[in-house]
Amino acid sequence: MGDRNNDGDQKMEDVLLPGFRFHPTDEELVSFYLKRKVQHNPLSIELIRQLDIYKYDPWDLPKFAMTGEKEWYFYCPRDRKYRNSSRPNRVTGAGFWKATGTDRPIYSSEGNKCIGLKKSLVFYKGRAAKGVKTDWMMHEFRLPSLSEPSPPSKRFFDSPVSPNDSWAICRIFKKTNTTTLRALSHSFVSSLPPETSTDTMSNQKQSNTYHFSSDKILKPSSHFQFHHENMNTPKTSNSTTPSVPTISPFSYLDFTSYDKPTNVFNPVSCLDQQYLTNLFLATQETQPQFPRLPSSNEIPSFLLNTSSDSTFLGEFTSHIDLSAVLAQEQCPPLVSLPQEYQETGFEGNGIMKNMRGSNEDHLGDHCDTLRFDDFTSTINENHRHHQDLKQNMTLLESYYSSLSSINSDLPACFSSTT
């Protein structure tokens, strides 16, 4: 019978030991291993050795352990420092173990029942007053005390230690030194080639930079749209009507990604006569080119020569581009011209603007000169001011038609005498 038990133990050792790693959880240490030790129910295989660890320094304990590579486990009796005290004696030959906090409860995974207690301790070299902290750590596991209190005489003299407090499982390990890790990491970084360090820095800078991408722009919103044209659109010379460049809405508020732009239109760099002409918003109708108007110094003779011919004025007003005046009114808020355009201006024809009132005061106060360049393409018309401008042109025509009757009342600046 005994031979069969020995054969069974030998087979169990052959099965468990090869490749075996002992990494129990806190619950397994308390509920299985420590509980069996307190109940005097040992295992057939000695995985945790019984040893009074306080008789040795922590750096000497790994050689006594049965298992473990970085953690070593021991059954340790809880001897009391004093006869009538529950405080254990944790003094060794080279130092002492000091608790870092209170006991932490260990709960069962099946419920909220406390099945054990865990305490953390640190080893100090030297005596209590001048001890030097080391990297050696210990976790002490023990069972909770019995709920039934015993009489004082029996507790302190006859049986000072309860069965649950008689044994503890101690896990010994050495904490990784943070200073050592910092030194190792510094030496590793310094040993890297310069190219690697440079690439790392460039990648960090690149990751912190916002990029804009034109191909990831959403559809334009209904507000804050910027209109631009494609200046590279070819133009056909055979067509009678000038081709209107394609105007596409573009919103700077609808970016979904911040990538670097690849093709971004810059209106300032491409600012020229054709670009300024096509910036004006308008309808699609084509306006004929109006004849050249006399300059400001030719107005007196022009008025005298045409005072008796009202048909010319009618033909003239029918060819006046009403949107030209509108374009002048809309030009300042639409575009800001470069410095060279502001200094030189646009050379072109002059027309009389907003002729209202009567007699010489009206004629002298409201004569203004508009200067435009040669408009070869269409100038679009703003629908909101269209009716007002047509009324102004009607007043202008009626005023010139009545010049024959008021020729004698003209001011001296419009007389034919020099």
Curated annotation (Swiss-Prot):
Single GO cellular component term: nucleus
Any GO MF annotation of the entry: DNA-binding transcription factor activity
Residue ranges of every copy of the NAC domain listed in the record: 16-175
Subcellular location: Nucleus
DNA-binding residues: 115-181
One record GO biological process: somatic stem cell division
PROSITE patterns (UniProt xref): NAC
Tissues expressed in: Expressed in root cap stem cells and their immediate daughters.
Keyword DNA-binding found: yes
Induction remark: Repressed by SMB in oriented-divised root cap stem cells.
Keywords of the record: DNA-binding, Nucleus, Transcription, Transcription regulation
Taxonomic superkingdom: Eukaryota
Xref: SUPFAM superfamilies: NAC domain
Pfam family, one: NAM
Record remark: domains: The NAC domain includes a DNA-binding domain and a dimerization domain.
Function comment: Promotes periclinal root capforming cell divisions. Activates expression of its negative regulator SMB in a feedback loop for controlled switches in cell division plane.
Protein name, entry field: Protein FEZ
Gene: FEZ
